[in-house]
Amino acid sequence: MTTKTGVSLILASMLTALHLICIELSFGQTTAVPFLLISSSPESNGQGTASVSRQTDDPFVVNFNPAHLGGMQNNFSVSFYPTKTNWLPGLGLKDLTYNSYVFCGKTNLKEYVSVPLSIGIAYSRVDLNLGTFNRTSAAGPDVIGIFNGEEHNDAMSLGVGWDIGIKLAMGITFRRIVSNLEGGVNASAWSRDYGLLMNVPIAELITKKPELIAGIAPLFDFSFGTALTNMDGTISYFDKAQADPLPRNISIGTSIVLGLNLIKIDSKIITFSWSRQADNILVGRNQDGSSYYRGIFGDLSFGKNIIQGKWTDAVKISQGWQIGLGEFIYIRQGSYQGGGFNYIKTDGLGISTSGLFKFLSLGAEGNTFINQLSDHFDLHYDQSNYDTNELDSPSNSTKFSSLSLFIKF
């Protein structure tokens, strides 16, 4: 039987590992379960982790703004990591890994009733494996057992979209969080996320004749998004009176998309998108060490942080761009800084079969198989990388990758 002292040593080792993660994640604040702040989207991570306002069907973005469910174009999608991410590889801990997967479904009510509404639902899972730890007793350093530390969350999300020319969406997530530090030293909590998203298709609204030239239409969209994540609840391992707060966070962002669309097959010949996002942890500490939640906007300033793009010690700024070529190749770059982070640059690449299927359909109008693929199926591969200007940063060479299947009925 493990003694109280043995458990304390185990917990101390585990919290040391968690502290290293906190250094990278919690924006200078002290909160529990900071793994909730890790961006799970390889697509977004290639663009500086900006995701709250981006126009995308990427299922992983639901983890940080459930309103995306109201604006997705596909009826069903699933995304997963083909290989686990080695989290903070600079630490040299091979069994410190991060993994995630998401299932999304959506229906357009306009197909059944004369209301321009759509409803989406999603389930997602995130796992952080903290590695294998030795269990010792109070009598000495002899190992009397081993255990695997891990944290995970399961989330159900619901989103509603309203298309009245301007596209509006809102969403909510219910999340169950479990932190397993050792047998008998486990903790769990519930939290909620709330999100809003607005997309303004400017070119469509102001141009009566969509063609820029024969058969080609311009694309110019602006979007705004915001989300409150990890709302409510605290988590404790021993004493509920000493519970730690969850990493409540406010995100606000804007995005633009420019491009050209081939009308005949509804294919984007080329697109350029850019996003900027500000994040602020809404947890403060009193002088006696107790915690409190700050106001809904915390230290955020729309003018300073979003328009000017200035980061501060309390506010993290993420920004990035993407170039899409024929809905086939996507090239991404970005960065984030502030809120406890030093400068981190990101890059990524995406490959989609959508453009390939649409291109093949141009010369296969009588080929039912090719047309079915073009109209109803899409496969994505996305990967991204983190690097810093510091040779000893734990984040250097962090790599994410995902595979996604999209089906449109």
Role assignments for model-derived ranges:
Residues 1-41, 408-409:
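Cleavable N-terminal export/targeting peptides
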Residues 27-409:
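Subset of outer-membrane beta-barrel
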